[in-house]
Amino acid sequence: MNPLISDFQTPQQRTPVIVALDFANEKDTLGFVRNLDPTLCQIKIGKELFTATGRSLAESLINQGFKLFLDLKYHDIPHTVAQACKVAADMGVWMVDMHASGGRRMMEAAAEAVAGYGTKPLLIGVTVLTSMEQSDLAEIGLNIAPEEQVIRLAKLAQSSGLDGVVCSAQEAAPLRRELGQDFVLVTPGIRLDVAGNNDDQRRIMTPAEALAAGSTYLVMGRPVTQAANPLAVLREVNRVANLEAN
C-alpha cells in the first residue's frame, strides 16, 4: 500500500479519477504506481500492458488496494465474452468493458455471467471511440453523427443490463437526459488544459467541464503519468470533484 494515503474518501465520497497506465512493461508500471494513492484514483490497464504482462500484474495491483478497470474492449460471440467477464470477476476486477456494437445477446450474456457474484464488476459498453469523427463513421458505413450513434448504443447497453458506457464528455449531458442519473458514464479524453491539444482523442474536456456535463468517471493518462507530481494532480482533480458535487 502506498504510504501517502490521504483522507479524501469517506463512505459518502468517491474519487472520479481513473488513471490509464499506458506503460509497455511491468517494471515501469509498478515504478509509477508507487507514486499513486488508491484513495485518490482507480487505475486502468489496456490491451498493450495486459498483453505484455498478463493476469499477474493485474492481480498485483488489485492486491495493492487499487480498483482496476480492465480495458480490453471485448467484442466476440456471447459465450466467449460471458466467460471472459467471469474470469475478470474471479480476479476481483472492478470494471470491465465491451463494444456495445457486439449487440444485445452479447451484452446480456455478459450481465448474466456476473450476476451471481457478491461483488461483481461494473460492465461498461464502448460506444464510439473518442478518436473517431463523423468521417470515420461514414467510412465504415454509418452515415450518422457520432453523438447520435453514442446515444443509440448507450440505450442498447442499458436495456441489455450493462451498468454504463464509455463516452466523450460532450455526449454526457444528452446521455444523462436519456438514461437517468444512475447510469455510469466513463469519459476518456480528459486533459488539464485543452488548448493546443492535438493528440489521438478528438473530443476532449477538462475535469471540471466533464463533471459538470455529467460524467461519472474521468480517464486520465498522460496528464497524470507524465506529471512532475502525480499526487498533486490527483488531489486537484478530486478537489474540483468535491466542488462540483456540492
Swiss-Prot record:
One of its GO terms (molecular function) is orotidine-5'-phosphate decarboxylase activity. The active site is at K73. Its EC number is 4.1.1.23. GO terms for cellular component: cytosol. Keywords: Decarboxylase, Lyase, Pyrimidine biosynthesis. It catalyses: orotidine 5'-phosphate + H(+) = UMP + CO2. It comes from the Bacteria. Substrate binds at residues 22, 44, 71-80, 130, 191, 201, 221-222. InterPro entries: Aldolase_TIM, OMPdecase, OMPdecase_AS, OMPdecase_bac, OMPdeCOase_dom, RibuloseP-bd_barrel. It is an enzyme of class 4 (lyase). One of its GO terms (biological process) is 'de novo' pyrimidine nucleobase biosynthetic process. Pathway: Pyrimidine metabolism; UMP biosynthesis via de novo pathway; UMP from orotate: step 2/2. Homodimer. PANTHER family: OROTIDINE 5'-PHOSPHATE DECARBOXYLASE (PTHR32119:SF2). Catalyzes the decarboxylation of orotidine 5'-monophosphate (OMP) to uridine 5'-monophosphate (UMP). Belongs to the OMP decarboxylase family. Type 1 subfamily. This is Orotidine 5'-phosphate decarboxylase. It comes from Neisseria meningitidis serogroup C (strain 053442). The lineage of its organism: Bacteria, Pseudomonadati, Pseudomonadota, Betaproteobacteria, Neisseriales.
